[in-house]
UniProtKB/Swiss-Prot annotation:
The modification Phosphothreonine is found at residues 499, 504. Its main location: membrane. Residues 259-681 are cytoplasmic. The keyword Repressor does not apply. InterPro entries: Kinase-like_dom_sf (IPR011009), PERK1-13-like (IPR047117), Pistil_extensin (IPR003882), Prot_kinase_dom (IPR000719), Protein_kinase_ATP_BS (IPR017441), Ser/Thr_kinase_AS (IPR008271). ATP binds at residues 345-353, 367. It catalyses: L-seryl-[protein] + ATP = O-phospho-L-seryl-[protein] + ADP + H(+); L-threonyl-[protein] + ATP = O-phospho-L-threonyl-[protein] + ADP + H(+). The active site is at residue 463. This is Proline-rich receptor-like protein kinase PERK8.
Amino acid sequence: MSLVPPLPILSPPSSNSSTTAPPPLQTQPTTPSAPPPVTPPPSPPQSPPPVVSSSPPPPVVSSPPPSSSPPPSPPVITSPPPTVASSPPPPVVIASPPPSTPATTPPAPPQTVSPPPPPDASPSPPAPTTTNPPPKPSPSPPGETPSPPGETPSPPKPSPSTPTPTTTTSPPPPPATSASPPSSNPTDPSTLAPPPTPLPVVPREKPIAKPTGPASNNGNNTLPSSSPGKSEVGTGGIVAIGVIVGLVFLSLFVMGVWFTRKRKRKDPGTFVGYTMPPSAYSSPQGSDVVLFNSRSSAPPKMRSHSGSDYMYASSDSGMVSNQRSWFSYDELSQVTSGFSEKNLLGEGGFGCVYKGVLSDGREVAVKQLKIGGSQGEREFKAEVEIISRVHHRHLVTLVGYCISEQHRLLVYDYVPNNTLHYHLHAPGRPVMTWETRVRVAAGAARGIAYLHEDCHPRIIHRDIKSSNILLDNSFEALVADFGLAKIAQELDLNTHVSTRVMGTFGYMAPEYATSGKLSEKADVYSYGVILLELITGRKPVDTSQPLGDESLVEWARPLLGQAIENEEFDELVDPRLGKNFIPGEMFRMVEAAAACVRHSAAKRPKMSQVVRALDTLEEATDITNGMRPGQSQVFDSRQQSAQIRMFQRMAFGSQDYSSDFFDRSQSHSSWGSRDQSRFVP
């Protein structure tokens, strides 16, 4: 029966504690349930009832006296302040329940453990309430359980670690999680009798209690601390990525614009070429330019001013379509039977030429260049690439090339009818007819004009001579070896300093031979020498001639002037021709030759002017540029034809262009008085 009094004694303290605790209890629920205002009424029974139910079993005999003393005892009041300073009261409550009820209190500890997140969340709305209430709730637990003071030393051990992380670092995340604990806490006190109700809530609160523990608080410390950093790094990274992506897109756009412009420049649909009116000795229309383009099967035809259709070669056309561009040395050696003497076609300044037959049965001419060596391979390829793009009816087509250790070889189409030099000067050859000579002169002029004005880049031949004018079976001229002088010079410059002038004696222009100045006019001079060969039938340098007449140009200069003035060609024309020529065509050819071999390069005509002069013999085209052969003064207009006077008046601004003038000019024209007949091949 002595046990009965303690129970009533315990109940008064509990009531006293309840009476004394209401202020703290009202403050205590504020700490966990500050966010929801509805929780204060159910919360007061939250902490005392479980304490009353759990504490009686252990301290039934010993706790009554201390239980009555603690409520008024000031020591209890004094003890909380250190707890407030060191750690919040929840840790004290954490330590006391576990020993009291191992079975029923585990739900309560998570409930008591869960309030720490609300204080973590509560500091943001009411910061002062979180600091003041904890000392007041602390008296009630120690008053009810004096026996746990032995265990209280253990909480301070975790408490030093807990206060710093909980109050300082956890505020941001708990607000989202603190909503669930308050909602669960009021439900638990509302159902005090049934203990099973907190049990289903425990798993929900355990994940919440994990972040609030000492170790979990450290985890929380890392999470919030890292999340702002991640957000900051994320924003900076996003900005950097955006800048990089913008630069990439900008570079792609610039590259696209550049490629489109480059493609427009190299568009195979735009064809450029040399426009030539139909000639009396030209081949059928459209055959002036042959295009070998692997990209387009049939290049478009463009109509010239005279109404004739001409095919134009593209500047970026590659090698001959559907054919190889590179050959091995062994293959070319096999094709030419080991470069045997029986296959030797000739030998020139750049090397020997051998005849060969490819595996597909195509006949080719293999030129083995004297220039070689391992150096200069890049320059050789560059020049070969330029040459391979040149395709014209009057130019020999380059089929391919070979670069070996010490060898450089070029493969051309084989032209079966030998060279102009062979047909003009070889002993025992039949005399070339005048019509054949005119055809050869016109074709060679077209090919050289194409090199000078329509190739990109323009090509200066540097070694135009009769042995480089090849003839096919119909005696159409094809210019060979163009670009080789440039290749030789580039390759020589890589091995040693070369100052030698490319060319053949007797064909070289005087300014090029003396000073090395190179221009298109040097090729014009060489072509003039070829015209003199066609007219006279003599070699450029003939040692069998009397002293002083070895040079063809120097011997022909005075005769050219006399032939133009007197229209007498007997002393100048090839004796083997006799009178088998057309005077009008002979006059025009003599005039063109005299203009091409002038001493002054500036006074020489362009090859396009020579082409027009040879193609339009019935028209009055002035290619003399107002100069007599061998003179350096301007023609006197009173001594010239009416056409020249008309051009001078147009040039110097005369406005007298009446019909009478044209009538007089046509009636007194020196060209009209001359009996001209158009030659039809």
